[in-house]
Amino acid sequence: DDDHSDDEPRESESSKPCCSSCCTRSRPPQCQCTDVRLNSCHSACKSCMCTFSDPGMCSCLDVTDFCYKPCKSSGDDDZZ
């Protein structure tokens, strides 16, 4: 009975939704991830925009009311 594995293909670590650079300037929060990734956005991004360079520099244009956890491994959280 692992019905949860049918919907989602196994994701690689790099495609999991995460955001190291997230900005919010309002209340309620409007957060937008400003991370730049090569050739694609994270798996939960609905609106992804990439440059036409090779490799493409892609950023997610979604505006949410939360930020994903940082992409870096935990332990680097103290640095601002």
Curated annotation (Swiss-Prot):
Entry's Gene Ontology cellular component terms: extracellular region
SUPFAM superfamilies in UniProt: Bowman-Birk inhibitor, BBI (SSF57247)
Keyword list, A-Z: Disulfide bond, Protease inhibitor, Serine protease inhibitor
Compositional bias ranges of the Acidic residues kind: 1-10
Site (Reactive bond for trypsin): 25-26
SMART domains: BowB (SM00269)
A GO molecular-function descriptor: serine-type endopeptidase inhibitor activity
Site (Reactive bond for chymotrypsin): 52-53
Disulfide partners: 18-71, 19-33, 22-67, 23-31, 41-48, 45-60, 50-58
Region (Disordered): 1-29
Start-end of Low complexity biased regions: 15-29
Gene3D superfamilies: Cysteine Protease (Bromelain) Inhibitor, subunit H
Family statement drawn from the similarity comment of this UniProt entry: Belongs to the Bowman-Birk serine protease inhibitor family.
Protein's name according to its UniProt entry: Bowman-Birk type proteinase inhibitor DE-4
Native organism: Philenoptera violacea (Apple-leaf)
